[in-house]
């Protein structure tokens, strides 16, 4: 405290304006110089420091606002993406169900088509068998008829002689003549 009062006393004892000198007493001059420098810094630096702090505050607030806007935009995009995902999942489920039903429908169509083809082949087989049976029966009939005819001709040829042959022809001619007279 004594040093502080000494420094104020020394201010009173300073020489007049014509002289300039350095006070080498550090303890006496330092608090005064520091108080003057701090006073000047506070007086002039207050506005600069206030401006710097205001600018910094505005940048931080602007960054926070931008971040908030980006966050809101990201949330909106996320919701849109989730909605699209739900829609795509529903469509995929629908395609899956439709695909299964389409597969079942195609399977039934194929089974029905195969059944119809088998039925048609069975009918064709039956018709072919029936046709072959009829042909075989006709061939057997023809063969039996030919053999019977040959046997009858053989019997007739062995039994017929010229005289019997002439009598048969005459009798037939007589019958035709009688029929002709009846119709005229």
Curated annotation (Swiss-Prot):
Protein name in UniProt: ATP synthase subunit b, chloroplastic
Classification via Pfam families: ATP-synt_B
Single GO cellular component term: chloroplast thylakoid membrane
Further remarks about this protein from its record: In plastids the F-type ATPase is also known as CF(1)CF(0).
Gene Ontology terms for molecular function: proton-transporting ATP synthase activity, rotational mechanism
Family, similarity comment: Belongs to the ATPase B chain family.
Primary localization: plastid
Keywords: ATP synthesis, CF(0), Chloroplast, Hydrogen ion transport, Ion transport, Membrane, Plastid, Thylakoid, Transmembrane, Transmembrane helix, Transport
Membrane topology recorded in Swiss-Prot or TrEMBL: Single-pass membrane protein
Organism (species): Buxus microphylla (Littleleaf boxwood)
InterPro entries: ATP_synth_b/b'su_bac/chlpt
Residues that span the membrane, as ranges: 27-49
Intracellular or extracellular location(s): Plastid, Chloroplast thylakoid membrane
Complex formation: F-type ATPases have 2 components, F(1) - the catalytic core - and F(0) - the membrane proton channel. F(1) has five subunits: alpha(3), beta(3), gamma(1), delta(1), epsilon(1). F(0) has four main subunits: a(1), b(1), b'(1) and c(10-14). The alpha and beta chains form an alternating ring which encloses part of the gamma chain. F(1) is attached to F(0) by a central stalk formed by the gamma and epsilon chains, while a peripheral stalk is formed by the delta, b and b' chains.
Function: F(1)F(0) ATP synthase produces ATP from ADP in the presence of a proton or sodium gradient. F-type ATPases consist of two structural domains, F(1) containing the extramembraneous catalytic core and F(0) containing the membrane proton channel, linked together by a central stalk and a peripheral stalk. During catalysis, ATP synthesis in the catalytic domain of F(1) is coupled via a rotary mechanism of the central stalk subunits to proton translocation. Component of the F(0) channel, it forms part of the peripheral stalk, linking F(1) to F(0).
